[in-house]
A protein has these predicted regions:
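Glycine-rich, proline-tolerant flexible connector loops at the mouths of alpha/beta enzymes
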Residues: 1-15
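Hydrophobic faces of well-ordered beta-strands that scaffold small-molecule active sites
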Residues: 2, 32-34, 71-73, 96-100, ...
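Active-site beta-loop-alpha junctions enriched in small/polar residues
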Residues: 3-7, 37-41, 74-76, 101-105, ...
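Catalytic PLP-binding core of fold-type I/II PLP enzymes
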Residues: 16-40
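Acidic (Asp/Glu)-rich catalytic clusters
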Residues: 22-27, 86-92, 159-162, 183-190
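Conserved anion-binding
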Residues: 36, 40-144
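A C-terminal functional module that forms or caps the active site or interfaces directly
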Residues: 145, 149-196, 200-207
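C-terminal helical cap(s) of enzyme catalytic domains, especially alpha/beta-barrels
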Residues: 182-188, 203-238
Length: 238
């Protein structure tokens, strides 16, 4: 799940590095989630969707630009911002993750506001489920949701609202989320959630637990962190 802002800050060379990262991951057989959090309307949203998930036309030819498998999308502008992504997802058989309840501490300033007695994130979750009915895969829809591990009780409610949506769960590890917090993000069959840990794995060697590896052996520290993460989540799911 490469975070595009970490590349954008370096300008054109950074964007070239982002493309190389995506290509390298795909060469290794990995599913790539472009953490781009795009949100606009009409032709602008369509351009974002085509640039990251589809193919852009140049004259009589077309080619894939960044070519991720999934992208994160901000729903604040409503269906006008999401529908262009849906069109590309259905054409390319790719997917999006819509921000529903994010893991950051101030997310509640807007996402928890009540509308007719219900928090906004529940209404967004219902919209994600509705969008998903228009773009179904075999078991799950092409429209997933971002729900932070730091809000497990809200995750429990949202899983019931969106039974056919993959839930991308950030906030594990560096932001404080634990395996026990993740149980309700999964369906009863143990599927349906994608748990993300970025800093907790990439920079594992900086943590006291893995400091013995040292910076020069950062990859070994990352492997150990992944193994511990898998054991933690499996243990919680039973």
């Amino acid at each position: 799940k490469p975070q595009i802002a970490m590349y954008e800050q370096f300008g054109i060379p950074g964007m070239q590095a982002f493309k190389k990262t995506v290509d390298y991951c795909k060469e290794k057989g990995l599913v790539v989630i472009g953490d781009i959090k795009r949100g606009d309307i009409g032709s602008t949203s369509a351009a974002y969707a085509v640039g990251h998930l589809g193919k852009v036309a140049v004259g009589s030819k077309s080619y894939a630009a960044f070519d991720e498998d999934f992208a994160t999308v901000n729903p604040y502008l409503g269906s006008d911002g999401v529908n262009p992504f849906l069109d590309v997802c259905k054409e390319e058989k790719k997917g999006i993750f819509v921000l529903v309840k994010t893991s950051n501490p101030s997310s509640g300033e807007f996402q928890d506001q009540k509308i007719d007695g219900r928090p906004l994130y529940e209404l967004v979750g219902e919209k994600v489920a509705a969008w998903g009915t228009e773009a179904m895969g075999d078991e799950y829809s092409y429209v997933g949701a971002v729900v932070g591990a730091t809000y497990p009780e809200m995750g429990k409610v949202l899983r019931k609202i969106m039974p056919k949506a993959y839930i991308l769960v950030p906030g594990y590890g560096a932001q404080g989320g634990k395996g026990k917090d993740l149980v309700h993000f999964f369906n009863e069959d143990g599927l349906g959630a994608i748990v993300n840990s970025s800093r907790g794995i990439i920079a594992a060697y900086k943590q006291e637990k893995y400091a013995k590896f040292g910076a020069e052996n950062f990859a070994d520290a990352s492997r150990a962190a992944v193994e511990d993460m898998v054991a933690d989540i499996k243990g919680a799911l039973g």
